């Protein structure tokens, strides 16, 4: 599967599982809501204190499997390096992340306050590999 097709699937299907690597080399997986930004990076909102962020600070590479709400159907796995954007730089990208996935928020001031309170960060995954290329 080419990167453009993989990103199109993620734009339409936001449910995903993110896989990061623990210090001992084992895999840690987290359910996430994924979107795609203007630079064709997969974007995910999470808390600064989440284990996935700790793992990505140590090894900034991840894999993500995205699938439809009904679970069965077309799915995609993408992999690549991850950038962590912390507040305050993350605020406007977090607003754009929300807009792309959910549309307009009824109270952007409240949204921004929650992002601050929760110490939200934005993960940006640059796709280097996408699949599957065959179905078994």
Predicted segments with their positions:
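Extreme N-terminal tail/first-helix region
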Residues: 1-16
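Generic structural signal for secondary-structure transition and capping sites
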Residues: 14-15, 61, 106, 130
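Charged, gly/pro-rich active-site loop segments
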Residues: 74-136
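Alpha-helix boundary recognition
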Residues: 10-11, 57-58, 116
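Short secondary-structure boundary segments
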Residues: 67-69, 127
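Short gly/pro-enriched beta-turn/loop segments at secondary-structure junctions
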Residues: 11-13, 29, 118-120
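Short beta-strand segments
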Residues: 14-48, 56, 62-66, 75-77
């Amino acid at each position: 599967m080419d990167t453009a097709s993989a990103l199109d699937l993620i734009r339409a299907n936001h449910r995903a599982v993110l896989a990061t690597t623990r210090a001992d080399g084992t895999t840690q997986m987290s359910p996430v809501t994924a979107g795609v930004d203007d630079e064709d990076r997969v974007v995910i909102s999470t808390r600064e204190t989440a284990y996935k962020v700790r793992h990505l600070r140590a090894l900034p590479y991840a894999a993500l499997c995205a699938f439809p709400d009904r679970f069965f159907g077309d799915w995609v796995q993408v992999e690549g390096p991850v950038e962590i954007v912390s507040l305050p730089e993350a605020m406007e990208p977090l607003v754009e992340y929300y807009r792309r996935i959910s549309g307009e928020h009824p109270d952007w001031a409240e949204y921004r306050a929650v992002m601050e309170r929760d110490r939200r960060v934005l993960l940006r995954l640059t796709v280097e590999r996408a699949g599957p290329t065959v179905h078994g």
